[in-house]
Amino acid sequence: MAKKSMIAKQKRTPKFKVRAYTRCERCGRPHSVYRKFKLCRICFRELAYKGQLPGIKKASW
């Protein structure tokens, strides 16, 4: 889990727009966040396997 202070800091509106960055809405992880879902790859995978993300299915070819 991310530091609570960093999660709180990220939720505030930055003084300059370029300072904003993505964090996972579920766990607060700052890296590998899918913008469309606002989830990191780990949380995305967990929710997708549980079927809690509508329209997402495992690829097979």
UniProtKB/Swiss-Prot annotation:
Keyword Cell cycle: no
Gene Ontology BP terms: translation
Family matches, as InterPro entries: Ribosomal_uS14 (IPR001209), Ribosomal_uS14_bact (IPR023053), Ribosomal_uS14_CS (IPR018271), Ribosomal_uS14_sf (IPR043140)
Cofactor: how and how many bound: Binds 1 zinc ion per subunit.
Residues noted as binding Zn(2+) in the record, renumbered to the chain: 24, 27, 40, 43
GO MF term list: rRNA binding; structural constituent of ribosome; zinc ion binding
Quaternary assembly: Part of the 30S ribosomal subunit. Contacts proteins S3 and S10.
Family as reported in the entry's similarity comment: Belongs to the universal ribosomal protein uS14 family. Zinc-binding uS14 subfamily.
Chain's role: Binds 16S rRNA, required for the assembly of 30S particles and may also be responsible for determining the conformation of the 16S rRNA at the A site.
The protein's name in its UniProt record: Small ribosomal subunit protein uS14
